[in-house]
Amino acid sequence: MNDRYPGFGKLVLALLSLALAPALTHASDAKPAVYRFSPVNQWDINRTATYWNPIIQYVSEKSGVQLQLKIGRTSADTTAYVLAQEVEFVFSNHLFSPERDALGWKVFGRRNAPPLRAQIAVAGDSPITSIEQLKGQQIGFAGPEAFIGYKLPYAHLLSRKIDATAVFGGNQNAAFAQLFAGKVQAVGSNSMLIDGYSVKENKKFRVLWTSEEYHDLALMYSTKKVPEKDVKAISAAFLGMHLDPRGAQILHAASNEVGLKQDAYFIPASDSDYASYRRFYQSAPASLR
């Protein structure tokens, strides 16, 4: 056929090239997925970013899957992004109520930090020495979404019929600052953040009440938005970070930045580790569910 129609083969190749060109162009233009990661604002926005940015940069490089930090001005703002399904990965304990369970989030890890306890505390030199003295007082909290820092201590106050006014600072450091500026008479928080602030800022607290133990916040992914292969890659990077000398160095520096007492790293976890959170909602006051 080529002998009878010189140049026919070249014509076919040219037509094939033209036909395939758009597909090849689209393939080369295709960008890898970028997943948004939203950790609860445990500190002010700058310190939260200082802690997490080096960690997620490492995880992105190690996994080959791009993560991007997405945090709001307050912890409530950040959780609003999550509830609006604007993110794919979180570090949170705000998603264990029955309504939020239905959103399709799944636990894959947590920090190896000691168990957290909710606490109600006053400044070390405060004249207040018992929780009953908080009746009619103002108590600072990070925000209404904070499970250990707000829902647990406020539920305890309600159970004791101690009528106090909640003042939301937007993040835990702001609530602590209000306490030591005399704008509130007590704070609700978790034990890790009280200990960390005490070390970092050289401040003394007097703890009036402590709850039972709860696991630290959970690393979670959206089962509706992230394919299994990307979950496995990101999970492996988080959970193996402390075994890599460079990863361990990043974790050490990040822990120092926020006043953590130890080099907290990430370990495997599952939804069953957070059963105590779900139990709370079975009997919690309606205003705290």
Q: Residue ranges of each PLM-predicted region?
A:
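Pocket-lining segment of extracytoplasmic ligand-binding domains
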Residues: 126, 137-236
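Short helices/loops that flank or line small-molecule/ion binding pockets
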Residues: 76-89, 103, 132, 173-188, ...
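Short loop->beta-strand "edge-of-pocket" segments that line small-molecule binding or catalytic clefts
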Residues: 33-43, 132-149
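Extracytoplasmic small-molecule ligand-binding "clamshell" domains
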Residues: 28-95
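N-terminal secretory signal peptides that target proteins for export/translocation
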Residues: 1-7
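Hydrophobic/proline-rich hinge and linker segments of small-molecule sensing/allosteric domains
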Residues: 107-130, 218-222
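An extracytoplasmic/periplasmic, membrane-proximal ligand-sensing/linker region
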Residues: 32-39, 43-54, 225-289
